[in-house]
Curated annotation (Swiss-Prot):
GO BP term, pick one: phenylalanyl-tRNA aminoacylation
Catalysed reactions, semicolon-separated: tRNA(Phe) + L-phenylalanine + ATP = L-phenylalanyl-tRNA(Phe) + AMP + diphosphate + H(+)
Keywords: Aminoacyl-tRNA synthetase, ATP-binding, Cytoplasm, Ligase, Magnesium, Metal-binding, Nucleotide-binding, Protein biosynthesis
Underlying gene: pheS
Co-factor binding details: Binds 2 magnesium ions per tetramer.
The EC number(s) this enzyme carries: 6.1.1.20
Protein name, entry field: Phenylalanine--tRNA ligase alpha subunit
Compartment annotation: Cytoplasm
Keyword presence, Metal-binding: yes
Subunit architecture: Tetramer of two alpha and two beta subunits.
Enzyme class, UniProt record, top EC level: ligase
Amino acid sequence: MHTLIERLEKVTNSKELEEARLNALGKKGVFADKFNQLKNLNGEEKNAFAKEIHHYKQAFEKAFELKKKAIMELELEERLKKEKIDVSLFNAIKTSSSHPLNYTKNKIIEFFTPLGYKLEIGSLVEDDFHNFSALNLPPYHPARDMQDTFYFKDHKLLRTHTSPVQIHTMQEQTPPIKMICLGETFRCDYDLTHTPMFHQIEGLVVDQKGNIRFTHLKGVIEDFLHYFFGGVKLRWRSSFFPFTEPSAEVDISCVFCKQEGCRVCSHTGWLEVLGCGMVNNAVFEAIGYENVSGFAFGMGIERLAMLTCQINDLRSFFETDLRVLESF
């Protein structure tokens, strides 16, 4: 049993220490074997041998605790040396990425501004004329029900789309006009694909009658969608908007399933991304324009961001969950 303590003194790490403990104190260790031998002894011989075993066992346990403490201190010192931090080193500041909505806005602006489109900014609070009537949406028009919004006592309202900026621009400027506007809009909706506040981008081009045709609109839209989404397929569908005539909606091939069919595209292989059309003459008449033509288009910025970031719940953009926002 003297050799147990001698072996313990040669231990240099935690693994060897545990092996020495099991060899001495384990169920099949040296001391367990010695205690089993007591059943073969009788009388004084048994008592003397039992005292001797206890003596060496206590001596080993004491030596083990001392060795354990020494090894723990040694390993801690070695670990601290390896993990030592030089406080004089420059601490790199963690840089965050752009919010998905800001990234989408900037990408849109980067496409249109080199083409001569001027970025216009409008008020969030509008009157009925600029938000509805001037856009061929007279009182009690059924299309107003789709744009239920927040009203104030003085007949003002939070704008339901960015189209009022087009009206203000035409009132303040004369053709030719090339403009885009981006900003917040408000409607009484809240679900997976709608929030009470959301962002839109709209574009308007106006010039002398005959200078602007639907083919110009088609070229701009197709160039933008290929720039934004890459090599997607496009599908044009006739539609209706009170402020454009003719009107169209544009779909892109599903970026999730590559037109194989999935829940996002309702197994059609297509995703709606924007609406557009030639500006309705009723809009020009409300402004006082004569002998002009033009086109307009609009799309939801959240919609574009959801498709590029592959997000199913629009509300994720506004919940300030860093785990979500830092994943883009």
